[in-house]
């Protein structure tokens, strides 16, 4: 409250103004309302320095007063025993549009007048009761509200606030579109607009399209979009709890079903339904089929577990819950003439073929041969699709009978496996597999065949020329040898004999693996170390020429030893070592080849043999070549090098002395020859000098007589040249005159030709002009005659002569002739004659 200020004792209070006056005697404050002139008493004090305006609330507005005064039922103020208005301290009062009113002492305006809130259509205010009160509605009905209650004030309308009610928030209606539903949840137990009792946490859908204003006990969960169903798409649903669906069918918790376009075009899942997945339609053509596992029983609507159903095209369907396709959609088995199907019975069933019936037991195998179409029934499993195998003469396959286990090979013609047969894969050792991929030749640069081998085909091997292959039959316990060139085909119980030969220099065991044994002739090289009688260690590099001697009665003898190269090198090496050990280094160094050949080949009757023959496998060594001999010991090698160097120096010095003597001898011979040549040259020089003197004398004589002859000859030649030049000049002048005359003639000819053509053109123009003039005159005359008419001409003819002349002159005729009709004139021929005469005269002028 403002501090009172003492002013004038007379205060003029205007209309709609007021002042607070304090009575100091009673300490009571009263209100004085204008218009009036207030005279303050001595015991009174005005609390306001100036009169205050009354509170004015415009229409459709309100304000809030704190600590309002108390009025009785008649609207009068209630005062206490001190004659002071009673206040509701701590309370508030909302006052609406009314006459201006003053504020009594203790009243406070919390909020200035504000407009009332207008609630639009599809809108509402969420209200909350702060304390208990009874609301009287417009229809005189009363509603009791308890503190904590919430309700909606729905539009359209104007909301008049109350101090007992709190506006929580504005609420707007939610628009539900077509093919859409609003999902709601109950915040507490209540009865909705459809008089349905809703429990706390219960959810439901509002499917009607349009505006929906959620209630105060309803919570919006979200929107549910409708599922669009087509002839190609369906949806699988799951019941989360037992309920009755929108089609009136009772669904139990956990039950699954599908909804298709036959049920409805669009479907909004209920709150008790869960969309598991969308299902696409399965379409079968007339060339397709499928097997459905656990099909739905149409009577009970449940899956027949463990059962299967065969479906064939043309048809379109959806898989029901619990159903599945075995191996998906399958095409009809179309068999050509060279194809067949191997079938197996999974259970016992009876197959009807025409009038006959065949009982198949579980595990039975049989085949269906083409050409035909075949759809296997449920009891039949297609084991494999077989095709007739084309085989050439040099091709084959291994076939095993699954009943007896016997394996055989089929060659030379196309073959279709029987129901109890299968292709057998022949196992081979890895080394044999690797050798089969390699070429049979010994060319190291030749490419290998890296493609994988079909182990069910008969194994073939091309034996190269001059080679042999041994094949062992384990069932018959015998071997056969094939000589090349030949193609080997292995039977099921046969295996190749793999040769493991020593290779490289020096020889290493098992370095060369091969299926074919080359018969030679060929050579091999080895490096061995020997020791002489005087303990000199030497390294020998030997080459052997060898070949096999084949015995036709016993060809397996060739493969008696698995490593003939190692055996050969060991045998010859031991012989060479023994022979070298009995010889000194100097002797062996001089006669190494003879010693080695004698040691290896031996001798008979005092003469050395020419070969070494191995009885075990028929190997023959025909020659030994010593390629190099090198000492192994460094000291021996150094002494050998020194001796060689000394021998080289001695030989070099002797050659130098011989060359020096020969050079001196040649030098002496060259000097003698040079002196002799000098003498001969001097004699020839004197002879040439005498000839020169004679020639000089002759030239002096000729010089004296030849000058006069030369001058006379020159003058004669000059005269001849001058005469010839004059003749040539005369000829050229004549030729020039002739050329000028010819050119002038040509110019005249060209000029005359041009003039003649010009005159002809003028004459032609004159002729054309004359012809056209004659034509014009003739036409003009005909037009005159036609214009005059026959009657007019007749009148002119009958007129006097003078009159005729005037009339004809008036027609523009310069000359005319009038005759009778009995003697006509041909004027056209006359004109032609005149024109012809003119043409003849022009030609004559030309």
From Swiss-Prot:
It holds the Pfam family Vault_3. MVP repeats lie at residues 2-60, 61-115, 116-172, 173-225, 226-280, 281-332, 333-388, 389-458, 459-521. Keywords: Acetylation, Cytoplasm, Nucleus, Repeat, Ribonucleoprotein. The modification N-acetylalanine is found at residue 2. InterPro entries: Band_7/SPFH_dom_sf, MVP, MVP_rep_dom, MVP_rep_sf, MVP_shoulder, Vault_2, Vault_2_sf, Vault_3. Disulfide bonds: none annotated. It is found in: Cytoplasm; Nucleus. GO terms for cellular component: cytoplasm; extracellular matrix; nucleus; phagocytic vesicle; ribonucleoprotein complex. Unknown, though MVP-beta is required for normal vault structure. The vault ribonucleoprotein particle is a huge (400 A x 670 A) cage structure of 12.9 MDa. It consists of a dimer of half-vaults, with each half-vault comprising 39 identical major vault protein (MVP) chains. Dictyostelium is one of the few organisms in which the major component is actually two proteins (alpha and beta). PANTHER family: MAJOR VAULT PROTEIN, MAJOR VAULT PROTEIN BETA. This is Major vault protein beta.
């Amino acid at each position: 409250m403002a501090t009172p200020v003492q002013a004038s004792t007379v205060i003029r209070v205007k209309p709609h103004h007021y002042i607070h006056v304090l009575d100091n005697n009673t300490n009571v404050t009263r209100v004085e309302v204008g218009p009036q002139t207030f005279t303050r008493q001595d015991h009174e004090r005005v609390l306001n320095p100036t009169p205050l305006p009354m509170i004015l609330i415009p229409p459709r507005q309100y304000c809030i007063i704190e600590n309002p005064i108390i009025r009785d039922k008649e609207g009068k103020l209630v005062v206490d025993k001190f004659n002071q208005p009673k206040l509701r301290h701590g309370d508030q009062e909302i006052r609406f549009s009314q006459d201006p009113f003053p504020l009594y002492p203790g009243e406070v305006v919390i909020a200035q007048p504000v407009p009332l809130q207008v609630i639009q259509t599809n809108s509402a205010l969420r209200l909350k009761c702060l304390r208990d009160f009874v609301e009287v509605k417009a229809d005189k009905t009363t509603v009791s509200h308890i503190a904590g209650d919430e309700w909606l004030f729905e539009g359209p309308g104007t909301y008049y606030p109350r101090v007992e009610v709190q506006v929580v928030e504005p609420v707007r209606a939610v628009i539900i579109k077509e093919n859409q539903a609003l999902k709601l949840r109950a915040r507490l137990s209540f009865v909705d607009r459809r008089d349905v009792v809703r429990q706390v946490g219960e959810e439901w859908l509002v499917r009607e399209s349009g505006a929906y204003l959620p209630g105060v006990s309803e919570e919006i969960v979200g929107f549910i979009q409708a599922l669009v169903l087509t002839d190609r798409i369906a949806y699988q649903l799951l019941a989360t709890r037992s309920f009755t669906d929108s089609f009136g069918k009772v669904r139990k918790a956990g039950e699954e079903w599908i909804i298709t376009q036959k049920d409805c075009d669009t479907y909004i899942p209920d709150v008790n339904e869960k969309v598991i997945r969308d299902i696409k339609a399965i379409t079968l053509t007339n060339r397709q089929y499928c097997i459905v596992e656990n099909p739905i029983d149409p009577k009970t609507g449940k899956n027949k577990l463990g059962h299967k159903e065969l479906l064939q095209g043309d048809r379109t369907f959806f898989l029901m819950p619990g159903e599945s396709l075995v191996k998906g959609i399958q095409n009809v088995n179309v068999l050509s003439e060279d194809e067949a199907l191997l079938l197996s019975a999974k259970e016992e069933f009876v197959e009807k073929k025409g009038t006959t019936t065949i009982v198949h037991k579980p595990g039975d195998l049989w085949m269906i041969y083409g050409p035909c179409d075949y759809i296997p029934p449920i009891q039949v499993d297609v084991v494999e699709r077989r095709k007739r195998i084309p085989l050439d003469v040099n091709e084959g396959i291994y076939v095993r009978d699954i009943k007896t286990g016997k394996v055989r090979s089929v060659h030379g013609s196309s073959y279709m496996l029987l129901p109890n047969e299968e292709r057998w894969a022949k196992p081979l050792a890895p080394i044999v597999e690797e050798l089969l991929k390699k070429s049979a030749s010994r060319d190291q640069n030749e490419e290998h065949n890296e493609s994988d081998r079909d182990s069910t085909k008969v194994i073939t091997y091309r034996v190269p020329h001059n080679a042999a292959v041994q094949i062992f039959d384990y069932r018959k316990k015998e071997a056969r040898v094939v000589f090349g060139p030949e193609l080997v085909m292995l039977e099921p119980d046969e295996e190749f004999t793999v040769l493991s030969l020593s290779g490289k220099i020096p020889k290493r065991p098992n370095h060369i693996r091969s299926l074919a044994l080359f018969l030679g002739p060929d050579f091999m090289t080895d490096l061995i170390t020997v020791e002489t009688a005087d303990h000199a260690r030497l390294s020998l590099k030997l080459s052997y020429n060898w070949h096999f001697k084949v015995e036709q009665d016993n060809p397996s003898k060739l493969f008696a030893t698995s490593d003939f190269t190692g055996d050969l090198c060991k045998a010859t090496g031991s012989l060479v070592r023994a022979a070298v050990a009995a010889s000194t280094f100097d002797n062996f160094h001089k006669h190494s080849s003879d010693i080695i050949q004698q040691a290896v080949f031996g001798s008979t009757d005092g003469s050395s043999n020419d070969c070494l023959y191995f009885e075990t496998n028929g190997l023959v060594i025909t020659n030994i070549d010593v390629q190099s001999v090198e000492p192994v010991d460094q000291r021996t090698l150094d002494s050998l090098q020194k001796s060689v160097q000394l021998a080289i120096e001695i030989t070099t010095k002797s050659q130098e002395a011989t060359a020096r003597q020969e050079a001196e001898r040649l030098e002496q011979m060259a000097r003698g020859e040079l002196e002799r040549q000098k003498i001969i040259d001097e004699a020839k020089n004197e002879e040439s000098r005498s000839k020169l003197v004679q020639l000089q004398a002759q030239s002096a004589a000729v010089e004296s007589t030849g000058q006069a002859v030369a001058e006379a000859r020159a003058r004669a030649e000059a005269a001849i040249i001058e005469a010839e030049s004059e003749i040539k000049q005369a000829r050229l002048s004549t030729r020039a005159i002739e050329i000028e005359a010819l050119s002038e003639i040509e110019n005249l000819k060209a000029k005359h030709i041009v003039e003649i053509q010009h005159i002809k053109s003028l004459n032609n123009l004159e002729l054309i002009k004359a012809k056209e003039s004659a034509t014009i005159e003739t036409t003009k005359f005909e037009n005159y005659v036609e214009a005059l008419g026959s009657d007019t001409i007749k009148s002119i003819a009958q007129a006097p002569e003078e009159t005729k002349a005037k009339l004809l002159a008036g027609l523009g005729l310069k000359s005319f002739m009038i005759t009778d009709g009995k003697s006509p004139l041909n004027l056209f021929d006359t004109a032609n004659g005149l024109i012809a005469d003119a043409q003849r005269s022009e030609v004559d002028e030309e």
